[in-house]
Every structure is written in C-alpha cells, then in structure tokens.
Amino acid sequence: MVSGSGICAKRVVVDARHHMLGRLASVVAKDLLNGQNIVVVRCEEICLSGGLVRQKMKYMRFLRKRMNTKPSHGPIHFRAPSKIFWRTVRGMIPHKTKRGANALARLKVFEGVPTPYDKIKRMVVPDALKVLRLQAGHKYCLLGRLSSEVGWNHYDTIKELENKRKERAQAVYERKKQLSKLRAKAEKVAEEKLGSQLDVLAPVKY
C-alpha cells in the first residue's frame, strides 16, 4: 500500500469482506506505522477461523476479564465489529508511544460502506484473503455474526443498509453501461458519416 519511503498522502480504502482478522490487522498495522492513512470498511464481513460456537466461547471468556475493584477501568470489551478490529490493530502497534498514537490516529474503521467511501475505489489485501489463507473445508465465522451474538444490536440494520447501497450501485452501473453503448453507437455513426475526413485528421491524431 505504501512506498518504500513510507510517505503516502493518499488515503487507502480497504474492503474487509472475507479477509482473515489477524492477517488483515497485521498488514494494516505495518502500513499505519509507515505513514499510510487507511480506511477499513465492511468490518462486519471479516472472517475468523473456527466455528461460531467456539469463537463465542472464547469471547465469553474474554468478557470475564475485568478489574475487580473498578471494572470500568478496564479492560474495555468492545462489541461492534469495527471496534473489535480496531482493538486488534491497536494490539499490534506501540500505541502508548507518540509514534504509535499517531499511527493509530491514521486508521478509520466502519461497518458497511458509509457515503464518502462508496464512490471511492476499494482495495483488497491478497495476503489476508480467506480463499487464499484458510484451508478448504475449514470452519469459519463472520465477525458481524459473532458481535450480534455477544451484544451488538445493529447487525440487521447494517445488512439492510448494505442491500440498499448495492441496489443503488447496480442502478448506477446499468446507467453507465447504457451510456457506454450509446456512445459507441454514436461514434460508429460519426465514423461512417465522416469517412475520408477521418483519414485526413489521423496523421495529426485529432
């Protein structure tokens, strides 16, 4: 994502759908420390290896970890998929140092694809894709489904908003395809009409 110099002003939007949690977090953490600005969308579609029951048991064990005298002091147990991913990245960054805090500030995480980023080209990370990293037939579960099982209440809302966004995107794509056909047809008609005049203009690359 980032050049060897570690300087890249451009913000990279990563589509987290069907990426493995730890592998994606490690790549994102490294690039954040190198100076890259990163936005991660569709965090609810991130995959975890292991079945849902197993992952839920692990998370319930994590929920029991707290400070006896004052539980609000920590650890903080995030339920939202975006915050779980953010916390995973934070664990791979020296976030208590100035450099680490600045790196973490360059990360934005979202469920779904909010409006500023739905019109920006999204990237994937091949090193973290489920189809390349998880053995065929191996059990896995989605982070959004796990979150909904342990107290996150917006899974259905995000799914509904995502369906609406996909419908809008499909309508835009169909319109663009139609305009492309009309343009090709108009160019063909103009080519037939102009004929020899185009041969005159060709040397000057008009």
Swiss-Prot record:
SUPFAM superfamilies from the UniProt entry: Ribosomal protein L13
Keywords linked to the UniProt accession: Ribonucleoprotein, Ribosomal protein
GO cellular component: large ribosomal subunit
Any one Gene Ontology molecular-function term assigned to this protein's record: structural constituent of ribosome
Domain of life the protein comes from: Eukaryota
Keyword Ribonucleoprotein among record annotations: yes
One Pfam family cited in the UniProt record for this chain: Ribosomal_L13
InterPro entries: Ribosomal_uL13, Ribosomal_uL13_CS, Ribosomal_uL13_euk/arc, Ribosomal_uL13_sf
Keyword Ligase part of the UniProt annotation: no
BP terms from Gene Ontology: translation
Annotated HAMAP family: Ribosomal_uL13 (MF_01366)
Family, similarity comment: Belongs to the universal ribosomal protein uL13 family.
NCBIfam families: L13_A_E (TIGR01077)
Protein name per Swiss-Prot or TrEMBL: Large ribosomal subunit protein uL13z
Originating species: Arabidopsis thaliana (Mouse-ear cress)
Gene behind this protein: RPL13AA
